[in-house]
């Protein structure tokens, strides 16, 4: 987790963004934003969690290879049920959600749970918040030269713990981000796209159980012929064909429509 390059996600190639192993210096931030803002295998065995730190503020050191120890502070958003060693974390000053096995990763040192709790805020427009979930959006960011950069993506869900934030992913960079999207919408920087082209959800019989890929191992063949493996860790309720994937060689959380790609 070294200092980020300071590039917008679009400056990362799609090979880096979705299909190649990403080293620690790829932890990134949308610094241009002026606001605060496959084949499926059997399930992987899970280990038991040590303690419940979801909702806590944490800090820890991070050392990779021969590099110096850097200090990181953030909020634990979730503990992954199919792999309780894995936590989803929003680090201060970064817009991506990261997945780390905090108690097992040897690169993590001096993990400390901070006494300060996450402040809860009343959401300003509950109807708008519900309306945008599952919708395609155009999200505007201001670049260093003052011009606007448009990113098309999908609002996936309200983020856990930090209740005024939303999970979102982008077509050009299919990893999990989180922003305070209601603020961006009211300031004209987020536009909800018409959903007339979306296909209607399939009809289900009463009591029908839809198969889920959560907990399954996945394998992805890269362009160079090598393979990367990972686990499906979450199914998006608003778009059941969309899943979160945590690859073994990366700490970003990837977002893929596995029905379209299977």
Swiss-Prot record:
Task: Write out the GO MF terms.
Answer: histone H3K4me3 reader activity; histone reader activity; methylated histone binding
Write out the ranges of the annotated region (Tudor-like domain 2).
Answer: 132-193
- For the region Disordered, what residue ranges are annotated? 1-51
Tissue and organ expression note: Highly expressed in ovarian cancer tissues.
* UniProt keywords, alphabetically: Acetylation, Cell cycle, Chromatin regulator, Developmental protein, Isopeptide bond, Meiosis, Nucleus, Phosphoprotein, Repeat, Ubl conjugation, Wnt signaling pathway
User: What's the effect of swapping residue 251 to R?
Assistant: Impaired binding to histone H3K4me3 and H3R8me2a and impaired ability to activate the Wnt signaling pathway
Q: Which parts of this chain are annotated as the region Histone H3K4me3 and H3R8me2a binding?
A: 93-98, 142, 250-252
Residues carrying N6-acetyllysine: 44
Q: Where is this site: Histone H3K4me3 and H3R8me2a binding?
A: 173, 180, 184
Where would I find the Glycyl lysine isopeptide (Lys-Gly) (interchain with G-Cter in SUMO2) crosslink on this chain? 7, 28, 44
Effect upon mutating residue 189 to A/R: Impaired binding to histone H3K4me3
**How does the annotation summarize its subunit structure?**
Homodimer; may form higher-order oligomers. Interacts with TCF7L2/TCF4; the interaction is direct. Interacts with HABP4 and SERBP1. Interacts with SPINDOC; SPINDOC stabilizes SPIN1 and enhances its association with bivalent H3K4me3K9me3 mark. Interacts with SPOCD1; promoting recruitment of PIWIL4 and SPOCD1 to transposons.
Report the family membership: Belongs to the SPIN/STSY family.
Name of this protein: Spindlin-1
Q: Which organism is it from?
A: Homo sapiens
The protein's gene is named SPIN1
């Amino acid at each position: 987790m070294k200092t980020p390059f300071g590039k917008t996600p679009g400056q990362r190639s799609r090979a880096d963004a979705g299909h190649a192993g990403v080293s620690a210096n790829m932890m990134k931030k949308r610094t241009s934003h002026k606001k605060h803002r496959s084949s499926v295998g059997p399930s992987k065995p899970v280990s038991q969690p040590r303690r419940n730190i979801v909702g806590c503020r944490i800090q820890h050191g991070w050392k990779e290879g021969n590099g110096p120890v850097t200090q990181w502070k953030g909020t634990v958003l979730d503990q992954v049920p199919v792999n309780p060693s894995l936590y989803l974390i929003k680090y201060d000053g970064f817009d991506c959600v990261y997945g780390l096995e905090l108690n097992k990763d040897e690169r993590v040192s001096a993990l400390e749970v901070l006494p300060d709790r996450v402040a809860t805020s009343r959401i300003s427009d509950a109807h708008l918040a519900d309306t945008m979930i599952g919708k395609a959006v155009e999200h505007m960011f201001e670049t260093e030269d003052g011009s606007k950069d448009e990113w098309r993506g999908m609002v996936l869900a309200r983020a856990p713990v930090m209740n005024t934030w939303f999970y979102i992913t982008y077509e050009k960079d299919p990893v999990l981000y989180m922003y305070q999207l209601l603020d961006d919408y009211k300031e004209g920087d987020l536009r909800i796209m018409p959903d007339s082209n979306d296909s209607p959800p399939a009809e289900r019989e009463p009591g029908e159980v839809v198969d889920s890929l959560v907990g399954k191992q996945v394998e992805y063949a890269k362009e160079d012929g090598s393979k990367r493996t990972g686990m499906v860790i979450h199914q998006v309720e608003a778009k059941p064909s969309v899943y979160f994937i945590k690859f073994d060689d990366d700490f970003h959380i990837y977002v893929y429509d596995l029905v379209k790609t299977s």
